[in-house]
Swiss-Prot record:
Gene Ontology MF annotations: calcium ion binding; collagen binding; metalloendopeptidase activity; zinc ion binding
Prodomain residues: 37-136
Glycosylated residue positions: N176, N441, N543, N644, N677, N791, N864, N918
Active site: E232
Occurrences of domain Peptidase M12A (ranges): 136-338
Lineage of producing organism: Eukaryota, Metazoa, Ecdysozoa, Arthropoda, Hexapoda
UniProt xrefs under InterPro entries: BMP_1/tolloid-like (IPR015446), CUB_dom (IPR000859), EGF-like_Ca-bd_dom (IPR001881), EGF-like_dom (IPR000742), EGF-type_Asp/Asn_hydroxyl_site (IPR000152), EGF_Ca-bd_CS (IPR018097), MetalloPept_cat_dom_sf (IPR024079), NOTCH1_EGF-like (IPR049883)
Encoding gene, per UniProt annotation: tld
Record-annotated EGF-like domain positions: 591-631, 753-793
Signal peptide start and end residues: 1-36
Functional summary from the UniProt entry: Metalloprotease which cleaves TGF-beta family ligands daw, Actbeta and myo in vitro. Cleavage of daw enhances its signaling activity. Cleaves dorsal-ventral patterning protein sog. Processes sog more efficiently than metalloprotease tld which also cleaves sog. Required for normal dorsal development. TLD may interact physically with DPP-C protein.
Extra remark: Mutations in TLD lead to a partial transformation of dorsal ectoderm into ventral ectoderm.
Keyword annotations of the record: Calcium, Cleavage on pair of basic residues, Developmental protein, Disulfide bond, EGF-like domain, Glycoprotein, Hydrolase, Metal-binding, Metalloprotease, Protease, Repeat, Signal, Zinc, Zymogen
Protein name per the record: Dorsal-ventral patterning protein tolloid
Length: 1067
């Protein structure tokens, strides 16, 4: 790994000659230059300590001699016992335990037993001898220690979710072995706090508490390692570097000749006025110690050499893996942690007070009744009087609660339990709400916190009289009901470690009236699956499992910001038995609609966002720099009532910009139409009848009087579009460019013409179509135009086709078709399926624009539907497929040349577009539903769409699909398109009908896929349009201000396909 230089050498050298004030700052702001540089000198195993891949605890990949033993299920932490082979418990005095546990050859091997003994020991000993006072590298200034051992923190938003998880892992590591508590900062409680950020110093932090409010702890490039963060937190807690102790020369040799020039000051010794003097020896294994080659001229030259280390000793000088034994004891002494107790971070465990497990005869005692055991003098001799004040800290993740089962308690009774007691608080410190204070004889109590932490303070001054204390069991549960009165966080179970298998958590959050619940994910990493069938987070607008689904999320992509429409939110987290990931961390916030309750000052539109609002503009305008007023932009409303004119793409004749969106509406006088003729056209892409314009494109609509947009066409490439005209008096153009290729754009001239069809239908019996300077009449299906050009007569060449497959051909095929005929074929298949038409032979009189003889195919029930293609000549068209369950085809010939016509086959395919209306409709999994099972290897997509102001509701009438545990074989998957990402409603299989589903938007997407094996009956689904819940947006509230003309068009064909688009609809 490549190291990073954190500060120029000259700058570092100047630090030693600065003013007295600068020296004072240097004393308390530690720059760990070595932490960034040393990474290039460490073995890969030390540099890349992968904390996530450990099976269960922090020590999973360490040397076996340093691995603490697993905690037994019945964890009795305060007093360890040995077991004889007979299985009986053997009594052992507390003093002898201390001696046995501390007779360890250097280096000291850290185990839970050692921690336990050191925490209990009243007089620490080594090899049976008291530890002498020696200098220890912790701050001597008591005001620099954090009050009550509570260190509030905030994390800069520049860090990723993985970084935030790593910071929390390091903080939990300190908490696990000390009484120090790292808590998320509450501005109302915590004036001083640390702030994880990035400074120019790279890896650096203040020594202890600064006392001036926000206190940075810099985790820069190459510093984001688990051990390095523990090291920097050590400085924050109050630790100097270990090698800066005054007695260090008795334990190490500083090889000054090997130190980089200008970096010698990093090895200076601190004065006695700067360090405390606890009762601990020099610690070569401290995480606060430099490595042997820190600031070395060369990786092969040592700057630090230990003294008197026996050959073969495993020494980890400068290790950045974990706290050493000495680090832990030193921190507990510095913060005056209780002589007994510990921190629990697991999901369940047992807590037993000192003395409880022994009676006078050395056998585990289960006292009964209310008798007083103080009369047993033999018991008194076994008790250590120093173990009368203990503190246990149970720490869960945000969104979890702690349940304590108090199995037995035996303490001296007193009024209000003022003498001896067990005090339980809902939180992390003495100011947290008091839940219970208990004394006397109690059993069977159950106590639950409302937060994710529980604090137990235990006082038993009369233990020597036989009051044995208590025994309890705790468990951590996730989910529950939350009353949201201020911002708070929820995390997946065990976060920031991997969540556990087979876990299900449900949170029901309720905000005050006139508020909404907002959710913002800060970290997200779940097992990935297309249908989120394995591990997922499901969010609903309400407080129960059948409330409106907002989204189901999995994978590692951060979900969008989410806000409910009501004042309640339902969050469900599920994990399966296989893959576990980091999980998630999210912030819950109260939110109000600022557009309703504040003077927003937006000139045009106000758009509510998460915790704020944004202003937007109407079509043809752009938001100015002040964020409130709007100005003219590309596009706009063009008044064509007085003269003709031209439209140009942005920047023409230069190339148009990237990421541009423009909307024009050309408005003609009443009873007039707009005609548009292109003289130049050059956009990215190639527009053929079998391709789509996916990059840059121009869409043209005819805007109807009721605001419906009827699509005329979408165009890209370099071929000139045909002359187009509006059906009524408004023509709408929408231009879009992406972020890549740019072209020269387009020029189009518009002219205004009287719409002859607007008066008395132009005299046409059936239909009138306006043309430039004139008009044309046409007839409905089954009729042909009479010689007078206005009236219609019935034709006999018409075919209504309702079968699911077949063959068709033109009249007289393979001979020449007749002259002057008008034939049509109307295909109609089962709802939810569509017709695919394939030509096998095709020969129709040729013309560049097919104005003589032609075959025209329409996507719907008549010629008024969208055109799929108009064909002539001798080339077989590509296969044509409708988007709905109807297709209309016309063969029209004139009095001139004749050809043999065509032969084609048609087949009904699943999928397509479905228009949801106020009336319930039903579609099926396959055309022959009810008589035959569905086919193998099917792949079907349906798009069910309602009007823009409505939602889609689907209900399953029958459901029978091959079952598999993951729905991997045959399945129906239901999603909907969102502004930033798709929402997954679920993947279904088996024989149980899925629940009713109501979309958040106006569209639902259904995908039915089957494999090559078993086939069952299939499904039947009814669908209809319904009113959505009260107005609000349930997806991404950090969206940027919409582009001018953000009233993005929606379109479908005549099969109930023209969509109403009122000006208030935001797409």
């Amino acid at each position: 790994m490549k190291g990073m230089r954190l500060m120029p050498m000259k700058m570092k050298a100047k630090l030693v000659v600065l003013s007295v004030g600068a020296l004072w700052m240097m004393m308390f702001f530690l720059v760990d230059y070595a932490e960034g540089r040393r990474l290039s000198q460490l073995p890969e195993s030390e540099c890349d300590f992968d904390f996530k891949e450990q099976p269960e605890d922090f020590f999973g990949i360490l040397d076996s001699s340093l691995v603490p033993p697993k905690e037994p299920k019945d964890d009795i932490y305060q007093l360890k016992t040995t077991r004889q082979h007979s299985g009986r418990r053997r009594k052992q005095s507390h003093k002898s335990q201390n001696k046995a546990a501390l007779r360890l050859p250097p280096p000291f091997l850290w185990t839970d037993d050692a921690v336990d003994v050191l925490q209990h020991s009243h007089s620490p000993t080594l090899n049976g001898q008291p530890i002498q006072r020696r200098r220890r590298a912790v701050t001597v200034r008591k005001e620099r220690t954090w009050d009550y051992g509570v260190i509030p923190y905030e994390i800069d938003t520049i860090f990723s979710g993985a970084h935030k998880a790593l910071f929390k892992q390091a903080m939990r590591h300190w908490e696990n072995f000390t009484c120090i508590k790292f808590v998320e900062r509450d501005p109302n409680l915590h004036a001083n706090y640390i702030y994880f950020t990035v400074k120019n110093c790279g890896c650096c932090s203040f020594l202890g508490k600064n006392g001036n409010g926000r206190q940075p702890i810099s985790i820069g490039r190459n510093c984001e390692k688990f051990g390095i963060i523990i090291h920097e937190l050590g400085h924050t807690i109050g630790f100097h570097h270990e090698h800066a102790r005054g007695d260090r020369d008795k334990h190490i040799v500083i090889n000054k000749g090997n130190i980089m020039r200008g970096q010698e000051y990093n090895f200076d010794v601190l004065s006695p006025e700067e360090v405390d003097l606890p009762l601990l020896p020099y610690d070569l294994n401290s995480i606060m110690h430099y490595a042997k080659n820190s600031f070395s001229k060369s990786p092969y030259l040592d700057t630090i050499t230990p003294i008197g280390i026996p050959p073969g000793t495993h020494l980890e000088l400068g290790q950045r893996k974990r706290l050493s034994r000495g680090d832990i004891v030193q921190a507990n002494l510095l913060y005056k942690c209780a002589s007994c107790g510990r921190t629990y971070q697991q999901n369940s465990g047992h807590i037993v007070s000192p003395h409880f497990i022994y009676s006078g005869n050395g056998v585990l005692s289960e006292f009964e009744g209310s008798g007083d055991a103080g009369e047993d003098p033999s018991a008194e001799s076994e008790f250590d009087a120093s173990l009368t004040n203990c503190e246990w800290r149970i720490t869960a993740t945000n969104g979890e609660k702690v349940i304590l089962h108090l199995q037995q308690l035996h303490l001296m009774s007193s009024d209000d339990c003022t003498q001896d007691y067990l005090e339980i608080r809902d939180g992390y410190w003495h100011k947290s709400p008091l839940v219970r204070r208990i004394c006397g004889n109690v059993s069977g109590e159950v106590i639950t916190t409302q937060t994710s932490r529980m604090l137990l303070n235990y006082v038993n001054r009369n233990a020597a009289k036989g009051y044995r204390g208590f025994k309890a069991r705790f468990e951590v549960v996730c989910g529950g009901d939350l009353k949201l009165t201020k911002d708070q966080s929820i995390d997946s179970p065990n976060y920031p470690m991997d969540y556990m298998p087979d876990k299900e958590c449900v949170w029901r959050i309720t905000a005050p009236d006139n508020h909404q619940v907002a959710l913002k994910f800060q970290s997200f990493e779940l097992e990935k699956h297309d249908g989120c069938a394995y591990d997922f987070v499901e969010i609903r607008d309400g407080n129960h499992s059948d409330s409106r689904l907002i989204g189901r999320f999995c994978g590692d992509k951060l979900p969008p910001n989410i806000k409910t429409r009501s004042n309640q939110m339902y969050i469900r987290f599920v994990s399966d038995s296989s893959v576990q990931k980091l999980g998630f961390s999210a912030a819950l916030m109260l939110d109000v609609d600022e557009c309703k309750f504040t003077d927003h000052g937006c000139q045009h539109l106000c758009i509510n966002t998460l915790g704020s609002y944004q202003c937007g503009c109407r079509a043809g305008y752009e938001l100015q720099a002040n964020g409130k007023t709007c100005e003219d932009a590309c596009g706009g409303v063009v008044d064509a009532t007085k003269s003709n004119g031209s439209l140009y793409s942005p920047s023409y004749p230069d190339v148009y910009p990237n990421s541009k969106q423009c909307v024009w509406e050309v408005v003609a006088p009443p009873n007039h139409a707009v005609f548009l003729n292109f003289s130049h056209f050059d956009l990215e892409g190639t527009r053929f009848h079998y391709t789509k314009c996916n990059y840059d494109y121009l869409i043209i609509y005819s805007k109807m009087r009721d605001n419906r947009l009827k699509k005329i066409g979408i165009y890209c490439g370099h071929e000139l579009p045909p002359v187009v005209n509006s059906e009524q008096s408004i023509l709408r153009l929408e231009f879009y460019s992406d972020r890549t290729v740019q072209r020269s754009g387009f020029v189009a001239k518009f002219v205004i013409d009287v719409d002859e069809c607007s008066m008395n239908n132009g005299g046409c019996q059936h239909r009138c179509r306006n043309t430039f300077g004139s008009y044309q009449c046409s007839c409905r299906n089954g009729y042909t135009l009479a010689e007078n050009g206005h009236n219609c007569t019935e034709t006999r060449c018409k075919f209504e086709i309702t079968t699911s497959y077949g063959v068709l051909q033109s009249p007289n095929y393979p001979e020449d078709y007749p002259r002057n005929i008008y034939c049509y074929w109307h295909f109609q298949t089962v709802l939810g399926h569509r017709i695919q038409l394939t030509f096998h032979d095709f020969e129709v009189e040729s013309h560049q624009e097919c104005i003589y003889d032609y075959v025209a195919i329409y996507d719907g029930r008549s010629e008024n539907s969208s055109t799929l293609g108009i064909y002539c000549g001798g080339r077989e068209p590509y296969a044509v497929i409708a988007s709905t369950n109807e297709m209309f085809m016309v063969l029209a010939t004139d009095a001139g040349l004749q050809r043999k016509g065509f032969k084609a086959t048609f087949v009904s395919e699943c999928g397509g577009y479905l228009r949801a209306t106020n009336h319930s409709q039903t579609f099926y999994s396959h055309p022959r539903y009810g008589s035959r099972p569905y086919k193998r290897n099917m792949y079907c997509d349906w798009r069910i769409q309602a009007d823009p102001e409505s939602s889609v509701k689907i209900r399953f009438l029958h459901f029978e699909i091959e079952y598999s545990e993951r729905c991997d074989y045959d399945y129906l998957e239901i999603t909907e398109e969102g502004y930033s990402m798709n929402t997954i409603h679920g993947r279904f299989c088996g024989k149980h009908k899925p629940p009713i589903i109501i979309s958040n938007s106006d569209t639902l997407l259904l995908r039915f896929q089957t494999d090559e094996s078993n086939s069952l009956r299939g499904f039947a689904i009814s669908f209809m349009a319904v009113d959505p819940p009260e107005d609000s947006v349930g997806e991404d509230f950090d969206a940027v201000t919409p582009f001018p003309g953000y009233l993005k068009s929606m379109y479908s064909s005549e099969t109930g396909s023209d969509h109403l688009l009122p000006p208030s609809r935001l797409i």
